Amino acid sequence: MHSMISSVDVKSEVPMGLEPISPLDLRTDLRMMMPVVDPVVREKQLQQELLLIQQQQQIQKQLLIAEFQKQHENLTRQHQAQLQEHIKELLAIKQQQELLEKEQKLEQQRQEQEVERHRREQQLPPLRGKDRGRERAVASTEVKQKLQEFLLSKSATKDTPTNGKNHSVGRHPKLWYTAAHHTSLDQSSPPLSGTSPSYKYTLPGAQDSKDDFPLRKTASEPNLKVRSRLKQKVAERRSSPLLRRKDGNLVTSFKKRVFEVAESSVSSSSPGSGPSSPNNGPAGNVTENEASALPPTPHPEQLVPQQRILIHEDSMNLLSLYTSPSLPNITLGLPAVPSPLNASNSLKDKQKCETQMLRQGVPLPSQYGSSIAASSSHVHVAMEGKPNSSHQALLQHLLLKEQMRQQKLLVAGGVPLHPQSPLATKERISPGIRGTHKLPRHRPLNRTQSAPLPQSTLAQLVIQQQHQQFLEKQKQYQQQIHMNKLLSKSIEQLKQPGSHLEEAEEELQGDQSMEDRAASKDNSARSDSSACVEDTLGQVGAVKVKEEPVDSDEDAQIQEMECGEQAAFMQQVIGKDLAPGFVIKVII
C-alpha cells in the first residue's frame, strides 16, 4: 500500500527571478516513519510558504489589472469611433431632413402661388365687367392725339405693300403740315451731330372710310354703338382742330393755306424763281424736281398746296434752326437735305466771298433790294474773327431775319412773296385781303386747353437776349484791349523818362491845348475826375521811379519831368471818354 502511494510534487508558478524554494512535503504516512521534526523549523517553513503564496497572488492581481486596462482602453477607443460615426450619420440625416423640408416648403409656395394666380384669373373677368360700368378719368387731348397718330401709322404700315412707293405729297397735307411746324422750343441748344437722328416715319396710304373710326371714348363719354353716330364722329374728327398744333397764331387751316398760295401765285409768275425765292441754288432745283415727280392731278387746286408745302420746306431748310436733343426731329416726308452744319458751311463760304467783295469795294447784288443792310450784317460777321458754332448759327439766323424784314419793308401793303418761317412772323396775309376773303371757321371747342406760349415770341426773345449778351461781351473785350494798350504805353514812357522828355513835353502842350478847347463843353466833369484821380494818386503814391541817386542840381529837373509826365498821362486817360472818378493805379 505504501508502495502504491506516489510522491506528489507541487510546482509553484513563480517567475524565474525568484529564489527556488524546496517543495513542501505533505505526505502523512512518511511522517510516522520519519522522525519528528523540530516545531520551530516547521513554523519557519510555514511562514515562508505563506509569504510565497501572497507574492504569487499580488503578481496575478497586477497581471489581471494590466490586462483589464488594455481591454478597457480598446473598448473606449472603439466606443468613441462608433459615437463619431453615429454623430456623422445623425448630422447627415438631419441635413437631408432640412433639405426635404425646404423642398416641401418651396413646393407648397409654388402651389399656393398657382392657386392664387388661378383664383385671380377667375376673378379678373367679372372685375373687368364691373369696371366698365364705372366712370374713369378723362384722357387728355394730347394722349388721344398720340394714340390716333399711332393707329394711323399702323394702318399706314399695313397699306404700304399694296400702295407701293407712289405716295405723293399732296395726298397727306396734314402730315406735311405737322412736319413743317414741329420745331422745338429749345432753340439755344446746338445740334449734337451733323445728321438728324434716324427716326423711322412711314407715310400712311389712302385710308378707307370703313376702317377709319376714332378711338373708343372713355366711360365718362359714353360709348357710341350706333353706326350713324360713329360716322358723324369720323366726320367731326376729320375737321376737328384738335389734331392741329395749339399755337393759334402759327396754325392756319388747310383751306386758308390754299388761298394764300393762290394769291401769291397770282402776284408772282413762278413760285420757285425771282425775288420771292431766297435760294436760287440747289434748293430751288429740289422743289422743281419734286414738283415734276408728283403724279398728275385732275384739278389744279390740288397742286397749289403741294407747291406751298415745298416752298415752306425750303424756307425751313434754309433757316436750319436748332432742334432739341431731347425731342425727336420730325422729318416726315421731307427730302434729303444737307444737315445744319453743312448749311452753315455753305453760308460761311458765301459770307467769305461777300466780305472779300466788300473789301475790294465791289457792291453786292442784294436779292431783296437792300444791299446796305446785308453788307453791314456781313461785315459784322467778319469782325468777329473766328466765332464758335453757336454764335455763327445765331448770326446766320439774324442775317436771314434782317433780309426778310427788308423784303417786308420793300413790299409794304401787298402779299409777302417769300414764305416766312413760323419763327419769323405770324401774319401770313395782309389785313385787307383777310377782310375781303373770310373763310368759315370751325366750331368752338367744348373746353379750354392749356397750350404753351407761341413759338415765335419765345424764340425771338431768346435770340434777342443772346445777341445782346454777345454784343456786350464784344464791347467789353474791345474796351479791355484799348485800356491795356494805354497802360502798357504809359508804363514804358515812365520807365524811360530820359529818352522821352521832348515827346512828353510836346504831348503835354498838345493835351493842354485840346483841354482848353474842350473846357467849355465838359469842364465840370473833367475837373471832378481829374481831382479824384490826383487825390488818389497823391494818397497812394502812384508813380515811383527807381533810379540811381543824382546830384542835388538835377533833383528839381527830375521832379518837374515826373510831374509833367503824370499830368500828360492823366490828361490822356481823362480824354478817352472814361467815367468820372475812374482811378488807374500804375505800379512799376
UniProtKB/Swiss-Prot annotation:
Q: What is the annotated tissue distribution of the protein whose record heads this document?
A: Expressed at high levels in heart, brain and spleen. Expressed in skeletal muscle.
Cysteine-cysteine disulfides: none
Free-text disruption phenotype from the record: Mice do not present any abnormality at early age but develop cardiac hypertrophy by eight months of age.
Give the enzyme's main class according to its UniProt record, as a single word: hydrolase
| Keyword annotations | Chromatin regulator, Hydrolase, Nucleus, Phosphoprotein, Repressor, Transcription, Transcription regulation, Ubl conjugation
Q: Where in the cell is it found?
A: Nucleus
Location of the region described as Interaction with MAPK10 in the Swiss-Prot/TrEMBL record: 175-343
Interaction with MEF2: region residues: 136-154
Which Pfam family is one of those matched by this entry? HDAC4_Gln
Q: Which GO terms describe its molecular function?
A: DNA-binding transcription factor binding; histone deacetylase activity; histone H3K14 deacetylase activity, hydrolytic mechanism; histone H3K9 deacetylase activity, hydrolytic mechanism; transcription corepressor activity
Query: Which region ranges are annotated with the description Interaction with CTBP1?
Result: 23-27
InterPro entries recorded? Hist_deacetylase_Gln_rich_N
Q: What is its main location?
A: nucleus
Chemical reaction(s) catalysed: N(6)-acetyl-L-lysyl-[histone] + H2O = L-lysyl-[histone] + acetate
Give the span(s) annotated as Interaction with ETV6.
218-261
The family annotation for this protein states: Belongs to the histone deacetylase family. HD type 2 subfamily.
> Protein name, please?
Histone deacetylase 9
Question: What species was this sequence derived from?
Answer: Mus musculus
